[in-house]
C-alpha cells in the first residue's frame, strides 16, 4: 500500500486538484498494478488521504478536501503549507510574471463575489517598476497555466479564485481582503459562493449550517429564524 500512497501523492502534485471521479480513475490502475484493494468509498479515500498527510505534514505539504460551490464539486487539493502569493508562481518565471500572479489574485479577491470577466484578467493590471511590460499573449499563457494548477477557475466567461488558492492562500486572502472573504463561523474555514442567512447575510458552508440546523432553527450569528432554503435550486 505504501507504493500506492506514493504514486497517488505524485498524481495529486501533478493535477493540483482532483474530483472524486478523477481520484477513482487514478487509484483503479494504481491499485491494480500493485495488487492492492482499491478504496471502495469516499470514507475509505478520506482515510487514505489522512494516512498520506501523516507522512507529508512535516514536509510542508498537505492534501485537503474542499467543497467548491462554483462547480458544485468537492475537490482534493494538493497544497504547500508555507505558500504566499509571491512564492506560489515563482518557479521559472520572471519578476514581472510573478507580480502578475499577485496582482491578478488581488484583483479577483477585491471583487464582492470574487470573480472577474475574462478580459479583465489582462486589463488595468499595472506591474510596478516594470521595464518589460508583459504581452497579452504571455498573460494568457500564464493564466491558463495557473488555471490548470487550480489557483484560478474559468467558468463561462468569468475567472474565479480556484480551489488551490482557497486552500493554500486562505490566510493571505482572509487577512488582506477581509471585506469580501471571511471564514465560516461554524468551521472556521474560508467560505465563498455559498449559503447566506436571509436576515444578517452572513455566509456559511452549506454542509456546516445544515448540520447546525438539525439541532436548532436560528442563525448562529444573528439569532433570527433561519429562512434560507438549504437545498440548492435547480436550473
Swiss-Prot record:
Q: Which major enzyme category is it? A: transferase
What catalytic activity does the UniProt entry give for this protein? S-ubiquitinyl-[E2 ubiquitin-conjugating enzyme]-L-cysteine + [acceptor protein]-L-lysine = [E2 ubiquitin-conjugating enzyme]-L-cysteine + N(6)-ubiquitinyl-[acceptor protein]-L-lysine
Q: Does the keyword Zinc apply?
A: yes
- Taxonomically, the superkingdom here is Eukaryota
Instruction: Please give the GO cellular component terms listed in this UniProt entry.
Output: nucleus; Smc5-Smc6 complex
Where it mainly occurs, coarsely classed, is nucleus
Query: Which cysteines form disulfides?
Result: none
Q: Decide whether keyword tRNA-binding is in the record.
A: no
Residues the record lists as Phosphothreonine modifications = 185
* Subcellular location(s) of the protein: Nucleus
Q: Which Gene3D superfamilies match?
A: Winged helix-like DNA-binding domain superfamily/Winged helix DNA-binding domain (1.10.10.10), Zinc/RING finger domain, C3HC4 (zinc finger) (3.30.40.10)
Q: What is its EC number?
A: 2.3.2.27
- What Gene Ontology biological process does one annotation of this record name? DNA repair
InterPro entries reported for this sequence: Nse1 (IPR011513), Nse1_RING_C4HC3-type (IPR014857), WH-like_DNA-bd_sf (IPR036388), Znf_RING/FYVE/PHD (IPR013083)
Annotated zinc fingers (RING-type), start-end: 181-225
Q: Which UniProt keywords apply?
A: DNA damage, DNA recombination, DNA repair, Metal-binding, Nucleus, Phosphoprotein, Transferase, Ubl conjugation pathway, Zinc, Zinc-finger
Q: Which GO terms describe its molecular function?
A: ubiquitin protein ligase activity; ubiquitin-protein transferase activity; zinc ion binding
Subunit structure as annotated in this protein's UniProt entry: Component of the Smc5-Smc6 complex which consists at least of Smc5, Smc6, Nse1, Nse2, Nse4 and MAGE. Nse1, Nse4 and MAGE probably form a subcomplex that bridges the head domains of the Smc5-Smc6 heterodimer. Interacts with MAGE and Nse4.
The Swiss-Prot or TrEMBL record describes its family as follows:
Belongs to the NSE1 family.
The protein's job, in short, is: Component of the SMC5-SMC6 complex, a complex involved in repair of DNA double-strand breaks by homologous recombination. The complex may promote sister chromatid homologous recombination by recruiting the SMC1-SMC3 cohesin complex to double-strand breaks.
Spell out the protein name for this chain: Non-structural maintenance of chromosomes element 1 homolog
Q: Which organism is it from?
A: Drosophila melanogaster (Fruit fly)
